From Swiss-Prot:
Residues binding hexadecanoate, per UniProt: 60, 93
Family annotation (PROSITE patterns): DEGV
Known function: May bind long-chain fatty acids, such as palmitate, and may play a role in lipid transport or fatty acid metabolism.
Superkingdom of the organism of origin: Bacteria
Protein name (database record): DegV domain-containing protein CA_C1624
GO MF assignments: lipid binding
InterPro entries: DegV, DegV_C, DegV_domain_contain
Alphabetic keyword roster: Lipid-binding
Domain called DegV: residue spans: 4-279
Keyword Manganese: no
Length: 280
């Protein structure tokens, strides 16, 4: 009898209800200031990160190898036979490589560590789908076979108030970090097949950029039913309006919303608005 554990990292932004429903094991990333280290979503909140960015921009680090080893030892003790792990894009963090390395040292558990090539709720959408399959009684091999297709069907699009935090954190990818800053040109950022940020399109100002996001959604939903996530990072006054705009579009199976993790917020800065599309 298979006993499958689901592992992810804190950038997947799985909420408490999902964690409880699917018994997800979450490995937290770290946020490091000059005088103190915090555990993502555990000992620091997104708002605390944004409130302090004008004073200090912290660095971030992946979950510790010790945390990963301890988790695997606990899973073995609890009789788990299989692990499905879904991580943030390996082009944005070393989490995938570290978890894969740790998993290879535990031969009593058959593991499949999967690079989401995504971030935030794009990563979380894969975890949710795997969790549903486990609850339905699907076996390990069946779920693993379906995961690459899940990844193909997920797209992330977002806008930020400024690119300076992506540039500072070295996460700028293929997004131009100089063009249009003074002209208030906003890139609509997405993630390509390699899990690297790129500019999907551009708009003049945030208002027009939001319109572009809605256009992308309408175009996609006109062709296929989708699950949609609306996300924000420190855009507390704007997220409800965006969700209202999205909710009026047809062919949405499930509409979810949430705030990105503090670790992600370090690299985007306040003001992020975005959507995740999962074609079903």
């Amino acid at each position: 009898m298979e006993k499958i554990a689901l592992i992810t990292d804190s950038t997947s932004d799985v909420d408490k209800d999902m964690i409880e429903k699917y018994d997800i094991k979450v490995l937290p990333l770290r946020i490091i200031y000059k005088d103190k280290e915090y555990i993502d979503r555990v000992t620091i909140s997104p708002r605390e990160v944004y409130d302090n960015l004008h004073i200090e921009v912290p660095s971030t680090s992946l979950p510790s190898m010790g945390d990963m080893e301890s988790l695997y030892e606990k899973l073995e003790a609890e009789g788990y036979t299989h692990v499905i792990g879904v991580t943030i894009s390996s082009n944005l963090s070393g989490t995938y490589n570290s978890l894969k390395l740790v998993s290879e040292g535990h031969e009593n558990i058959k593991s499949f560590i999967f690079d989401s090539r995504s971030i935030t709720m794009g990563e979380g959408a894969i975890i949710k789908e795997c969790g549903e399959m486990i609850l339905q009684g699907k076996n390990f091999d069946y779920i693993v076979e379906k995961m690459p297709k899940m990844r193909e069907n997920i797209k992330v699009y977002y806008i930020v108030d400024t690119l300076k935090y992506l540039i500072k954190g070295g996460r700028i990818g293929k997004v131009s970090g100089t063009v249009g800053q003074l002209l208030d040109i906003k890139p609509i950022i997405s993630i390509n097949e390699e899990g690297v940020y790129y500019t999907h399109c551009k708009a003049k100002g945030k208002k027009q950029a939001i319109k572009k996001l809605i256009e992308i959604l309408r175009r996609t939903l006109s062709e296929k039913h989708c699950d949609i996530w609306v996300m924000h990072g420190g855009a507390y006054d704007e997220i409800d309006k965006l969700k209202d705009l999205v909710s009026g579009i047809e062919n949405i199976n499930n509409l979810n919303s949430g705030e990105i993790s503090p670790v992600a917020g370090v690299h985007t800065g306040p003001g992020l608005l975005g959507v995740v599309i999962f074609k079903k």
